[in-house]
Amino acid sequence: MDESNLLQGISMIDLRSPDAILSDYAKRYAHLLPELSPQLQQRMAYMPEPDAPRLPLTKPAWLSDRSCTLTPGQAIDRAQGALLGLAIGDAVGTTLEFRRRDQGQVSDMVGGGPFRLAPGEWTDDTSMALCLADTYASQGKFDFATFADAMVRWYRQGENSANGRCFDIGNVTRRALEGWEAQGLAWMGNLEASTAGNGSLIRLAPTAIFRRHSLSATWWESVTQSSVTHRAIEVSECCKLFGAQLHLALNGADKEEALSPKVRPLQPRALIINAGEYKHKTREQIRSSGYVVDTLEAALWAVWNTDNFRDAILLAANLADDADSVAATAGQIAGALYGVSGMPPEWVAKVAWSRHICELASRLFELAPQGDEMDELLSGSE
């Protein structure tokens, strides 16, 4: 069904509405939920037929990878753009961080903000992304303990901080890292809905770059990296959706394709974002808080309503509140769409650690595993 026809005349719902209302409302997007395959239904059957032949597992169609339609140079440009775009959005947005909307305005990378940063310096969004990128670069895969330890070094010692100290960290992230220090893998916190902050969404680009050949690996590893600090269901849902959108953009999709509704198994709030309702909302209907649903919706709204990297970042940052995180999230997808080549050269030159960030993105690009690990898993499942 055509997206514009589907949404025409519909009053966009507030994603802060009660769960019961949202669940009922989201039924209109049931066509975006995949049907259970015969193979999966057979394995889920409470009373399976004893003599029925066991159907082989196959990868569902909705997890099909997008073939890369870019030249190698274009693909690297977009990969670097996703990670550098995160840092640039962070550095631009920090000026208005914690400010009420329209109490100030930013039109350039000027620093300042609550932490009185120099122009080009960034906050915890980028620091965490660099910890994640370092994990992939050093291990050639995602490793929970390596990532958690890197995050602790940032928290305690200022590693991967633009100014050598951890001056900004979310409460949920702090609690998780202290839990890791105390209990290691035995710690299983931050599952509550009240912990559904944006801390793992804002650092996601390294996973999408490293797993660029496989949508299924991107989908699941978006959740795995999140689980180090954020395990609430809504965070996992938003990370999966955003990871899938980054996968499309990194492999050549334009804005319309990357942000178009796709068949995906998502719960109501993420499903409604996937359906694209944010595209029809006004600025007044968009929230820019640290709640993961607000952050993702605001970032996608800013990218959808612009046609270049600079304008997307400024539109996101000027929403204020958690401005750095909204702009960092917008910067990931805008950078993956427009590449470093589409960024203002003065921002690329000014943002802290610009060369290192681009080199790290290139390293993840080169290390990206070929093929689809889910296909290998399924081929050996019988």
UniProtKB/Swiss-Prot annotation:
Cofactor binding note from Swiss-Prot or TrEMBL: Binds 1 Mg(2+) ion per subunit.
Keyword Hydrolase: yes
Cofactors, names only: Mg(2+)
UniProt region (ADP-ribosyl hydrolase domain), positions on chain: 81-373
Record's keyword terms, sorted: Hydrolase, Magnesium, Metal-binding
Domain of life assignment: Bacteria
Molecular function GO terms recorded: ADP-ribosylarginine hydrolase activity; metal ion binding
Region described as N-terminal extension: spans on this chain: 12-72
Chemical reaction(s) catalysed: N(omega)-(ADP-D-ribosyl)-L-arginyl-[protein] + H2O = ADP-D-ribose + L-arginyl-[protein]
Phenotype of gene-disrupted mutants: Decreased fitness in interbacterial competition assays against S.proteamaculans.
EC number: 3.2.2.19
Group of enzyme by EC: hydrolase
Residues holding Mg(2+): 123-125, 168, 324
Similarity-based family: Belongs to the ADP-ribosylglycohydrolase family.
Job description of the protein: Orphan immunity component of an interbacterial competition system (also called effector-immunity systems); this bacteria does not encode an identifiable cognate effector protein. Expression of this protein in E.coli partially protects the cells against competition by wild-type S.proteamaculans. Probably acts as an arginine mono-ADP-ribosylhydrolase, mediating the removal of mono-ADP-ribose attached to arginine residues on proteins. Probably de-ADP-ribosylates FtsZ and possibly other proteins.
Protein name per the record: ADP-ribosylarginine hydrolase Tri1
